[in-house]
Each structure stands twice: as C-alpha cells, then as structure tokens.
Design a protein with these regions (language model features):
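Central regulatory/effector-binding core of bacterial HTH transcription factors
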Residues: 1-59
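A bilobed periplasmic-binding-protein/Venus flytrap-type ligand-binding module shared by bacterial periplasmic
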Residues: 74-77, 173-183
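Short amphipathic alpha-helical coupling segments at ligand-binding clamshell hinges
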Residues: 14, 146, 182-196, 202-204
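Short loop or secondary-structure boundary microenvironments that flank
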Residues: 8, 100, 177-180
Length: 206
C-alpha cells in the first residue's frame, strides 16, 4: 500500500478521477489518501509521500514537478449574465471571494494586468478551493481557481470565465517523498505513473 497525503481539492478534482488507471495497472497496490493542507514533517506521520502546492525544497526530501497553478477568474452565469463585455477593471465592482492560503491572489492577478484596485483584498475568505468553487457556483462572488480544478464546472456551464487571462501563481504542485524512500518499489511505480499523467495533462493544455 501507499500512504499519500494530498491537498483535498486536488485529490477530489484531479487525482481521484485518474486513479482508476493506476489501480487497473497495479491492482495489488492500494493507495490511501489523507487530506493535508499545510507543510509537515514526514517523520511525524505514517505517510510515504505527498502532493503539495508550494515550495519543493522540504529538508530531506526528493520531489517531482507536476504542474503550475494557473488561476482563472470565474463566476456563476447568474452573477455575470448582465455584464457580457466585462473588462478586468470591472471585476473590482463585483464581490471577490478570497483564499486564506493565498491572501494576495486577487492583487497579484490584477497587477499582472497592470491594474491597481483599492478593494482587491476585501471579500469573504475561505481556506479550500473546493469551498471557494461552491461559493462561486452559487453566485456569492467571483473566484480565482486553478483551471485544472474546475474543468468540469466550466464544461457544464456552472462557472464561466470572466476574461481570457490566466495568472500563473508562485505556487507549483509537486509530488514529494523522503529521500530514503527513493528506492521503494511501490512509491517508484506510483511516482512514474503520476509523472506520466501530469506530463500528459500539461502537454494537452493550450
């Protein structure tokens, strides 16, 4: 078995839908998922590896890059239906949903467009992308969400992109594991599979 710590929304929206492929290839390996939203020490847990958004430089670990975090500004169709010609500056007049783990995300997004908005830090603050996504779907505000977490919501029309602009945040997603487990057969099989899945996903992006 493999004990894997993973940020919950990534697990639910990206990893779990693909995990059946790994189970088909390796039916004798069970992958146990535990929710982790903050950095931790492997020595304090029973985890073999983790998928984390942030810095890969954890002491005593090795890592495999998975993908960048490309944030898209989205909202519910009902919230934006009367504003069909939105420009980036117009978004400041709509409620902005904030992420407690990325408190300056909207400011960085606006600045990437050369804009400085007075109320860019205001708005309801939430910890997880899953919660923020649901709040946006229910019309409670605009959200900045990584595209790979909301592809189905965009496809089904539950969320709509507000303008054609993706902001690459300073966070990247990595597969991280203790260096002493580098030769672990189960971990190596999962790492190889995950790397292939992430590479396929990245190459399919426009």
């Amino acid at each position: 078995a493999l004990e894997l710590g993973v940020v919950p929304t990534f697990a639910a929206k990206w990893l779990v839908p693909r995990l059946g492929d790994f189970q088909r290839l390796h039916p004798d390996i069970a992958v146990h998922l535990s929710s982790r939203t903050r950095p931790f020490l492997f020595a304090d847990t029973a985890l073999d590896a983790a998928i984390f958004a942030g810095d890969a430089g954890w002491p005593g670990t090795a890592s495999c890059f998975l993908m960048d975090e490309r944030l898209v500004a989205v909202g519910s169709p009902a919230l934006v239906k009367t504003r069909r010609t939105l420009k980036a500056a117009d978004l400041a007049h709509l409620p902005l949903l904030q992420m407690s783990t990325r408190p300056y995300a909207w400011r960085q997004w606006f600045e990437s467009l050369g804009l400085h908005i007075d109320n860019d830090l205001a708005g309801a603050r939430m910890e997880l992308f899953s919660i923020t996504t649901e709040a946006a779907i229910h019309g409670q505000g605009l959200a900045l969400i990584p595209r790979f977490l909301i592809e189905e919501d965009l496809k089904q029309g539950r969320l709509v992109p507000l303008i054609e602009h993706e902001f690459v945040s300073d966070r990247r997603y990595y597969f991280i594991y203790p260096e002493q487990k580098s030769d672990n057969t189960v971990l190596a099989l999962f790492r190889s599979w995950l790397d292939a899945q992430a590479t396929r996903y990245r190459e399919a992006q426009p």
